[in-house]
Amino acid sequence: MKAILFVASLLFMTTAQAEVFVVNDKIEPVTLEDQFEQPLVVNEQTQWVLFSRGMKGGELIQASLESLPAEKQPENLVYIADISGMPSLIARFVAIPKMKDLPFSMGLDREGDVTATFPSEKDMASVIKLDKFNVVSIEHFDSSGAITEAISQ
């Protein structure tokens, strides 16, 4: 009897987990604080979301955005980083102060809840194209040049 209850609870737990959104899904508006504690919003006008769940993906996005002059960066681009895996003391006293030196804003998901449904691949950056909250495409890149090329279209 205990085994049956255990298996049933495992089945329930897997169905209760958030599913990653895919192409043709409609996402909800997102609001996060950036590294300056200002709101950063994914709204109806947002066409590009750059997303990183790990350090490597974040480095790729940073290199891509730093390589583009400010006037060449798409206006409707939002960068979001899931920093929930980072120890809070490291985030507070080391990482976020360094992020304040960057020439762009990045939404910080400190708990990982907001971005739980965001697609990601290990050591890669995700580039999500939106049209009024509808997911048009999802690509994962392992080079900053490829990210720059994708968002410059």
Residue positions per predicted region:
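Cleaved targeting-peptide boundary
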Residues: 18-25
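Short, internal strand/loop/helix patches
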Residues: 78-79, 95-120
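Structural microenvironment flanking redox-active thiols in thiol-disulfide oxidoreductases
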Residues: 48, 57-98
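Thiol/disulfide oxidoreductase modules built on the thioredoxin-like
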Residues: 43-44, 110-147
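Positively charged n-region of N-terminal signal peptides that target proteins for export
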Residues: 1-4
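N-terminal signal peptide c-region/cleavage motif recognized by signal peptidases
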Residues: 13-17
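Solvent-exposed loop/turn segments at secondary-structure junctions
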Residues: 55-57, 83-87, 112-114, 135-136
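A short beta-strand-turn-helix
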Residues: 29-46
